[in-house]
């Protein structure tokens, strides 16, 4: 984003504006990706910003709010910073050491997170739900509902 101000504008202000417009348009379910460790009281700017977003969203009033909280996103993309490249190479090995309560910090493929977002829309559950590593993996496995075709 270039600066903390720009990061907050993109990751909080624009997401909240979009959520408000969606709610005004009668959208009943909202799915958002934040981060494992998101906390509005965190000292870390990134985690605090994500936590502030999480804290603000329930007040908008969606029937269903699904908060996806992945660890580091891994995978290949066109433009990769050195940090992203290192994560994509070493995180799959590092994941093996992240067990028990630390499992939530495992790196996860961006495609898996995208599938989990779609899966969240298929649960039919109402309320606010947070999903970390295992929950994201489970949501990603929910198959699409069969389409009904006319004719």
Sequence positions of predicted segments:
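A short helix->loop->beta-strand "cap" motif at the edges of active sites that frequently abuts
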Residues: 25-29, 61-63
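Oxidoreductase cofactor-interface core, primarily capturing Rossmann-like NAD(P)-dependent enzymes
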Residues: 40-146
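Conserved internal alpha-helix in NAD(P)-dependent oxidoreductase domains
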Residues: 12-13, 28, 52
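SDR active-site strand-loop-helix element
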Residues: 30-36, 68-70
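NAD(P)H-binding glycine-rich loop region in Rossmannoid oxidoreductase-like domains
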Residues: 1-17, 21-24, 39, 121
């Amino acid at each position: 984003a270039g600066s903390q101000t720009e990061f907050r504008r993109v990751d909080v202000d624009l997401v909240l504006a979009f959520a408000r417009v969606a709610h005004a348009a009668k959208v009943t379910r909202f799915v958002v990706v934040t981060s494992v460790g998101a906390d509005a009281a965190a000292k870390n700017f990134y985690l605090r910003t994500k936590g502030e977003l999480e804290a603000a969203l329930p007040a908008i009033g969606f029937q269903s709010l699904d908060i996806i909280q992945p660890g580091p996103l891994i995978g290949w993309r066109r433009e990769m910073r050195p940090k992203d490249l290192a994560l994509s190479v070493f995180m799959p090995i590092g994941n093996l050491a992240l067990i028990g309560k630390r499992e939530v910090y495992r790196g996860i493929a961006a495609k898996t997170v995208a599938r989990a977002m779609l899966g969240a829309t298929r649960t039919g559950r109402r309320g606010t739900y947070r999903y970390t590593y295992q929950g994201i993996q489970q949501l990603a496995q929910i198959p699409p509902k069969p389409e009904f075709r006319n004719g």
